[in-house]
């Protein structure tokens, strides 16, 4: 097992693992992970997020689909760290989402904690459960499936 103190990834390392960039990079830091098992990361939600201009004026709430995307990105990091695959050659595609539940709104100033646990891995498919928390309270949850594919096949 990896010592959690050794498993912290900062934004520079995350940029080397995910193809996402502003404004769609939704993971700021990884605080713990165990390859093939789980990951804990977070996204600092600020009023400067472009989506708050229209969602919703006067009552800014993070869109649920972006909470799911943040969970999927954390899950993507877990997949990368669970394989020997060269990241530059691969894409991780969100292929399915089940049992989505939004429990609590996410507002500017919140620290969105992203927890993903690997459920199953078969060939190119990875299935995991994701949960997003704010202040220790469940904000959203889902079961997600992703496929790993070669960039050249796209």
From Swiss-Prot:
Keyword Cell wall biogenesis/degradation assigned: no
EC number per UniProt: 4.2.1.59
Record-level Gene Ontology MF annotations: (3R)-hydroxyacyl-[acyl-carrier-protein] dehydratase activity
Entry-linked SUPFAM superfamilies: Thioesterase/thiol ester dehydrase-isomerase
NCBIfam families: fabZ (TIGR01750), PRK00006.1 (NF000582)
InterPro entries in UniProt: FabA_FabZ, FabZ, HotDog_dom_sf
Family: Belongs to the thioester dehydratase family. FabZ subfamily.
Annotated keywords: Cytoplasm, Lipid A biosynthesis, Lipid biosynthesis, Lipid metabolism, Lyase
Protein name: 3-hydroxyacyl-[acyl-carrier-protein] dehydratase FabZ
GO cellular component: cytoplasm; membrane
List of catalytic residues: 55
Catalytic activity: a (3R)-hydroxyacyl-[ACP] = a (2E)-enoyl-[ACP] + H2O
Organism listed in the record: Nitratidesulfovibrio vulgaris (strain ATCC 29579 / DSM 644 / CCUG 34227 / NCIMB 8303 / VKM B-1760 / Hildenborough) (Desulfovibrio vulgaris)
Top-tier EC class: lyase
Gene: fabZ
Localization annotation: Cytoplasm
Function recorded in the entry: Involved in unsaturated fatty acids biosynthesis. Catalyzes the dehydration of short chain beta-hydroxyacyl-ACPs and long chain saturated and unsaturated beta-hydroxyacyl-ACPs.
One GO BP: fatty acid biosynthetic process
Entry keyword annotation includes Transmembrane helix: no
């Amino acid at each position: 097992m990896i010592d959690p103190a050794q498993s912290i990834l900062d934004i520079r390392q995350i940029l080397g693992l995910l193809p996402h960039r502003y404004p769609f990079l939704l993971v700021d830091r990884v605080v713990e992970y165990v390859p093939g098992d789980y990951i804990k990361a977070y996204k600092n939600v600020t009023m400067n997020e472009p989506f708050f201009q229209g969602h919703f004026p006067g009552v800014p709430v993070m869109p649920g689909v972006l909470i799911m995307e943040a969970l999927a990105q954390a899950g993507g990091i877990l997949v990368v760290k669970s394989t020997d695959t060269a990241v530059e050659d691969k894409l991780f595609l969100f292929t399915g989402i089940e049992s989505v539940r939004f429990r609590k709104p996410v507002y500017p100033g919140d620290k969105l904690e992203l927890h993903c646990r690997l459920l199953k891995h078969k060939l190119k498919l990875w299935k995991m459960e994701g949960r997003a928390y704010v202040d220790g309270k469940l904000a959203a949850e889902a079961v997600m499936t992703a496929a790993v594919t070669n960039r050249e096949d796209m």
